[in-house]
Amino acid sequence: IHAGGLRYHGAGSIVSQLLRDGLIEAQAVPQLETFRAGLLFARTEGIVPAPESTHAIAAAVREALRAKEEGASKTILFNLSGHGMIDLYAYEQYFADKLQDYTVTDAELRRTIDQLDRIIK
């Protein structure tokens, strides 16, 4: 699991339980979509969000667009976990078209899990 600048690549126990209980849902958002959402947020709110926060912003934008399509009035809440002033290099890479979307295949994931199983045993 990876979200921008996060250094903890796993799932917290509280988040995992909330997901298991059906109180939240998980979404995968491609990297380029997250940066587009981050730029939209920066331009409208005047805050450059941290790359990890852009994932939440992108999901909120998706929800807002879905509500608009449905003609529904919704309150949408997301967490802005930090500013991106120390992550400007990531934005520089985005503007230079040096970032790309990458999706791990099921086969790659299975190989990695199999390797972990051998290490742990």
Tell where the protein language model's regions lie, with residue ranges.
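Short amphipathic alpha-helical surface patches that serve as generic macromolecular interface elements
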Residues: F35, T54-V61
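Hydrophobic alpha-helical bundle architecture
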Residues: L40-E52, R62-R66, E70
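Generic serine detector
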Residues: S13-S16, S53, S73, S81
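Catalytic phosphate/nucleotide-handling subdomain of diverse soluble enzymes
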Residues: A59-I120
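Glycine-rich beta-alpha junction loops
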Residues: L6, G10, E33, H55, ...
